Structure formats: structure tokens, C-alpha cells
């Protein structure tokens, strides 16, 4: 079965508010085997909401509408849904009595406007709200099920778990959604899609989604099936050929970030790592230390933003800086060697470059980045030219450095 979620409230269209309810509902519906195919946010506009409800109920089996059940004039959900379905909206004496008792128990005065919350759509069932004063409603229309839920997350979650899930369990066919998340480093989104599209386009189930971030691509496979074993078989049918095509560019098959994967490899080897950073100003060290237990393998870092610090803390020679510049293969190599020498770490990573928006050296274009790794076997330096703003470039190069470390540990050929 397919579902749609409609979030109501003009405040949800501002940059200050985030619709977290839809994330929760999507996770819960997926557990039932229900696929959420559409989400939208609509302001406090009765006509727009009514139009959306008509479209959603006509095409999806489950429609969940969140918010807009309060007592004020801008709480338009009840009126809009009644309008969309051409049903009456009437004052329900039982709900009104319940509301009056709620206010009395709290020793609060019930304002006249609160009676708006006692209006019920013709044919709807009441969903009690034990955490607020906005009852929900459940109704059926043309074979579809619609739910009206309160906007406050603590009210919505309690109502959905106690009132909606039992009802849905009775009407939703038994189905399972199985997922597989692969994460890839070392290639761009368009190159990756061109390589694997001939595989995944053969299948409607599992569905394949590609999500790209700076230096990191996620491949999401979602299989809808009757049993977990059937779903796993469907996933394997698609994932197998993709894994053969991508090879060691895949660094995670369970959604783990690159810093988590690298941390696991270092722990397994009882190895350590340190960092020496210039352009990234500590971002690489921060990523490594976000992993719980990273003190087992992270020895420390040096932020050597100017040449004086590179010389004093890392022992980079003045001759290298003068002849090649701070942004160069030679400086990156010297930084990694110096950091490893001073910390006695198994591995040392270094980053130097021009992150922008301007470059300190007119000979070095913005986006020029060098990262180096040093270990007992020697050093390796990788140079890349990145596009984007300052933050994006810095994120790209930290991803490149972490992947360089992963490949060094596992003995893969560097292609990042």
C-alpha cells in the first residue's frame, strides 16, 4: 500500500520550523510495509488543503494529515477535509463533554473557541488524545483511509501508536520493506549512475535511489516483499552486480560513515592516526573524533594555518615552503611526515590547499587541494581540484583524506 503525508501550518513554511512528524510517520509506516510516496507542506489555507486532500485520497490508500486541529481560526484541517469529501462538519456532544472534563480536571477555563475542537466530520471515528485537547479523526473514503492527527510531536506519536497502528494493522496487507544502503567514495554521481544504471533500471522492485553529498554517494535499495528472506533475495539480485561494478569504491554496506569505517579498521589493527591540517582548520580531526571510542586510535592533530606553524610544529623546511609554496605536493608530504614523527602514530594524514573564496597565492586556483598519508611504508600524496563554496571544498577534501586512509589500510589502489 502507498501513503501520503500532508503537514499543515504556515509556520512549517518558515526556515525556523522543521517537519519532524513526517520522518517519524515514514519510519512507522515502513515497518508495516507501507511505502510513503508523497509528502507536502501546506499553509493555513482551507482551499489549498481541500484540493490536496481530494488529489491524495484519489490516488493513495492511506493519507495522513498532521496539524491544524487546534481551536483558533487558522486551524483549518477539519473544515478543509470536510469540504474536500463533501461531508458535514457537526458539533459532537461526546467530544465536547470530554473537552470540558479535560479543562475542569486541569482547573482551567475553557474558552468558547475550544468548542471548535469538538466538531467532527460526518462518518469519522474519534481518535482520543490523552496528551492534549485536539482529538484526531479516522475516516474512509472510496477505499482509502484518512487520518487527522495533531501537530505537536508528543501528541501525534502517542495517538499514532495507540490509536492508528492497531487500525492500520487490520487493513494493511502483510508486507515487509527491506533496505540496503551502500556508500561510495572516489567517484562523482553522474559517473556512478552511468555505470550502474543498466543494472538497477531493470527492476521496479527493489527501487533504487542515489543521493549525493560532497565526496560521498549513497545508493539506497528498497525491496517490498512478503517476507524478510524474500526481500533480502531481491536486494541481493540487484546489489550483487552493482558491487561487482563499483568494487572497492564501496566503503560501507550498512550506511556507516567513512569515519566510522576507518575507525573500525584502525581498531582491528590496533593502529593509530594523527592529522596535520591547514586549509581545513581541524575538520578532519573533528570527523575522526566524532566516533565514540576514537581515543583508542586518534593520537592528536596539528592545525598549522600559516607557514610559521608548519615550520615550528611539523618541521616543514623553509626551503620547501619557499620553493614550492604552502599549497603543494611537497608541503603536504612534509606535513604528514612531521606529524607522524612527532606523535609516533601508525598513520599521519595531512591537508593543505586553497578553500576560498580567495586564494592567498594567485598561482593556486581556489579548490586546489593536496592530501598526504605517511606510514612505515612511505608517503603518498593525492592532488584534486574541487568546485564549490568554502565549506563544500573543505568537506570534499576531508572525505578524500579519510578514503586515502581507508585504502592505505586495506591495501587498495588509490583512486579517490
Swiss-Prot record:
Against InterPro entries, the record matches this protein to:
CinA (IPR050101), CinA-like_C (IPR036653), CinA_C (IPR008136), CinA_KH (IPR041424), Competence-induced_CinA (IPR008135), MoaB/Mog-like_dom_sf (IPR036425), MoaB/Mog_dom (IPR001453)
Q: Which CDD domains match?
A: cinA
Domain of life, per UniProt, equals Bacteria
A Pfam family matched in the record: MoCF_biosynth
Alphabetical list of SMART domains matching this protein: MoCF_biosynth
Record family assignment? Belongs to the CinA family.
- Name under which the protein is recorded: CinA-like protein
Amino acid at each position: 500500500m502507498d501513503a501520503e503525508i500532508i503537514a499543515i501550518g504556515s509556520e512549517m513554511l518558515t526556515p525556523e520550523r522543521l517537519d519532524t512528524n513526517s520522518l517519524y510517520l515514514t519510519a512507522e509506516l515502513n515497518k508495516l510495509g507501507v511505502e510513503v510516496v508523497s509528502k507536502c507542506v501546506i499553509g493555513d489555507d482551507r482551499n489549498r488543503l481541500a484540493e490536496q486532500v481530494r488529489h491524495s485520497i484519489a490516488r493513495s490508500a492511506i493519507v495522513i494529515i498532521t496539524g491544524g486541529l487546534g481551536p483558533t481560526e487558522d486551524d483549518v484541517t477539519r473544515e478543509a477535509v470536510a469540504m474536500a469529501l463533501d461531508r458535514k462538519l457537526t458539533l459532537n456532544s461526546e467530544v465536547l463533554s470530554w473537552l470540558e472534563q479535560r479543562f475542569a480536571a486541569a482547573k482551567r477555563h475553557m474558552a468558547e473557541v475550544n468548542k471548535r475542537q469538538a466538531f467532527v466530520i460526518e462518518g469519522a471515528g474519534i481518535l482520543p488524545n490523552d496528551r492534549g485537547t485536539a482529538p484526531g479523526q479516522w475516516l474512509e473514503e472510496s477505499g482509502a483511509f484518512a487520518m487527522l492527527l495533531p501537530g505537536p510531536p508528543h501528541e501525534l506519536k502517542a495517538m499514532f501508536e495507540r490509536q492508528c497502528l492497531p487500525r492500520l494493522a487490520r487493513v494493511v496487507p502483510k508486507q515487509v520493506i527491506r533496505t540496503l544502503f551502500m556508500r561510495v567514495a572516489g567517484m562523482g554521481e553522474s559517473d556512478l549512475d552511468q555505470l550502474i544504471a543498466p543494472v538497477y533500471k531493470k527492476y521496479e522492485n527493489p527501487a533504487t535511489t542515489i543521493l549525493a553529498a560532497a565526496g560521498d554517494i549513497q545508493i539506497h535499495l528498497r525491496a517490498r516483499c512478503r517476507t524478510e528472506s524474500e526481500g533480502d533475495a531481491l536486494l541481493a539480485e540487484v546489489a550483487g552486480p552493482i558491487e561487482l561494478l563499483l568494487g572497492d569504491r564501496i566503503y560501507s554496506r550498512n550506511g556507516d560513515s567513512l569515519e566510522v569505517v576507518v575507525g573500525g579498521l584502525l581498531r582491528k589493527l590496533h593502529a593509530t592516526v594523527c592529522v596535520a591540517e591547514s586549509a581545513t582548520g581541524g575538520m578532519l580531526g573533528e570527523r575522526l573524533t566524532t566516533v565514540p571510542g576514537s581515543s583508542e586510535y586518534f593520537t592528536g592533530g596539528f592545525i598549522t594555518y600559516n607557514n610559521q606553524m608548519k615550520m615550528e610544529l611539523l618541521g616543514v623546511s623553509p626551503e620547501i615552503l619557499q620553493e614550492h609554496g604552502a599549497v603543494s605536493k611537497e608541503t603536504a608530504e612534509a606535513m604528514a611526515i612531521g606529524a607522524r614523527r612527532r606523535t609516533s602514530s601508525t598513520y599521519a594524514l595531512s591537508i593543505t590547499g586553497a578553500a576560498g573564496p580567495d586564494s592567498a597565492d594567485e598561482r593556486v586556483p581556489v579548490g586546489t587541494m593536496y592530501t598526504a598519508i605517511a606510514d612505515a611504508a612511505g608517503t603518498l600524496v593525492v592532488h584534486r581540484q574541487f568546485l564549490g563554496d568554502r565549506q563544500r571544498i573543505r568537506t570534499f577534501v576531508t572525505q578524500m583524506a579519510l578514503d586515502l586512509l581507508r585504502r592505505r589500510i586495506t591495501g587498495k589502489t588509490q583512486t579517490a
